[in-house]
Each structure stands twice: as structure tokens, then as C-alpha cells.
């Protein structure tokens, strides 16, 4: 049995002016360093484990999967350290974002995650702004992200920031019943006829 999840591919021209978000003094930006890879992974996990995207991308539903995902991102050609950030409050990580610049100048924003309990505080906008700045500084001309169609709040935010919906892509996930449990596994994403790229949530 399979389930198909529609996702919007959203893009923006760079540079994109994102309004300055006044963060509390207790907040700290933590730039990328390889030693923070597990901190990014755990923040991704805490941000997405109970969200619908954990069905779309099963790796998000467990810590090991998030570690594998984060290692895959930072090993990707075009990984953008300047677009990869942790946000901490009093030394506790509450937000994460990663970036990749492709050869054609597309800057991919990946895994914009805010830990529950710290949302609706402007942290998402701040993370996106940091990522876009880093992608542009690395040579990206266009910013791109994917968002699940049902994530209305995120879509509204991205539209407000200046992103536009470029196309709809479809991700098919295999769902297998096993003893009263549901086991999910991702199948290759498919897109509408127009050729496109795939990025993580």
C-alpha cells in the first residue's frame, strides 16, 4: 500500500530582503562546524518527529534517521556551511536549518525546524533569513524549498516572505502493515511533467 503526498516547490530570487527579527538576548546563533552534526540531527528530530513531514520523510521519525540525513546533507557536493545554522536559547538548541548550492545557482533550504514550545516567536523567519543570506553569499541566484501542501502556516509564511509556488511535486511513500504497526518507507519522488529538483523538508 502506498500514500502520495503533494508538496509545493517554492522559489524566490536572491537576494531576498527578509525583515530583521529582534531575537531575545538569550538567543545565540551557532554557525556550522562538523562537530555540531549530531546537534543538528537531534534538533531536526525534535522539530519533526510528531509532524506530518515524518510520514513524508520517514527518516525524520527517529534519531538515527536524522543523523543519517544530516550526514548526507553535509557530505553533499555544494553543501553550504554559511547557510547552515543552529539557534540556541540559554545553550539549548531550539532551531536548525541547512543549505546546499547546486551547480546551476539554485540554493536549497532544507529542514527549517523549530522545536515545539518555541514556535510563533519569529525564529522560523530568522532561520530562513540566515539561510538565504548564506546561500546568496555562496553564489546562489535563486532560493528554493519544498513544503507539504497541508502545512498551511508554513506556506503562508513563505509567501509572505516573497517565495512563490513554482510547481507541485508528489512524493510516494510505501506503507506496510506489520503486526499492528505501520512501517513506512520512502519511494522515489515524482514531479509534474516539468523537470525539477528535490530537496528535503
Please identify what each model-predicted range represents.
Residues 1-34, 172:
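Acyl-donor-binding surface of acyltransferase catalytic domains
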Residues 135-146:
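Conserved GNAT acetyl-CoA-binding A-motif
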Amino acid at each position: 500500500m502506498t500514500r502520495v503526498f503533494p508538496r509545493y516547490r517554492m522559489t524566490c530570487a536572491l537576494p531576498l530582503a527578509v525583515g530583521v527579527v529582534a531575537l531575545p538576548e538569550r538567543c545565540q546563533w551557532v554557525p556550522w562546524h562538523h562537530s555540531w552534526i549530531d546537534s543538528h540531527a537531534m534538533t531536526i528530530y525534535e522539530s519533526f518527529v510528531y509532524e506530518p513531514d515524518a510520514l513524508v520523510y520517514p527518516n525524520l521519525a527517529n534519531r538515527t534517521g536524522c543523523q543519517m540525513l544530516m550526514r548526507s546533507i553535509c557530505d553533499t557536493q555544494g553543501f553550504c556551511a554559511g547557510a547552515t545554522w543552529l539557534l540556541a536559547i540559554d545553550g539549548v538548541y531550539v532551531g536548525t536549518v541547512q543549505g546546499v548550492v547546486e551547480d546551476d545557482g539554485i540554493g536549497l533550504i532544507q529542514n527549517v525546524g523549530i522545536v515545539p514550545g518555541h514556535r510563533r516567536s519569529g525564529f522560523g523567519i530568522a532561520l530562513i533569513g540566515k539561510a538565504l543570506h548564506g546561500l546568496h553569499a555562496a553564489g546562489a541566484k535563486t532560493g528554493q524549498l519544498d513544503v507539504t501542501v497541508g502545512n498551511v502556516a508554513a506556506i503562508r509564511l513563505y509567501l509572505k516572505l516573497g517565495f512563490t509556488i513554482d510547481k507541485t511535486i508528489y512524493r510516494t511513500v510505501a506503507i506496510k502493515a506489520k503486526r499492528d504497526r505501520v512501517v513506512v518507507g520512502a519511494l522515489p519522488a515524482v514531479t509534474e511533467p516539468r523537470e525539477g529538483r528535490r530537496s528535503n523538508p
